């Protein structure tokens, strides 16, 4: 029989994060050991169908009208969302996670995956108008905003010292599993 105190205790459990950002410590078979940015040791089971994508730096000028992008934004001082990072999806990933939702990178941040409808170049960067199925957003991208794109990757990229973001879920036995990992190339720390 489940008691009210048991239900209360379960309700108080912190939610399992859906992603971990950090540095690969080791790979042992199907286990990926990661030191999270917050210093926690995290062990992830790598699913058999796991996808590994590389991330590489590109320039702000590589963001074109028609590009499908993801951007983490925070509220700007003038009310216009300011990009913390921008990732340009390759054409075969168009539509991935389309929309805008809260995100856990920074306080009050959101993630928006959308198509660039307009880009205006100014003295302090670009102002992007992005559109997604349920809306649109204006985003300020400064010259110092990290801009990256995805490139093919594989499990061999997951070696000690690599900087990653892994998307994970909690399994019924309490362990964590990942089926998607993005790994920075050439020393890049995934900015998202």
Identify the function of each model-found stretch.
Residues 6-192:
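Short, flexible, surface-exposed loop segments at domain boundaries
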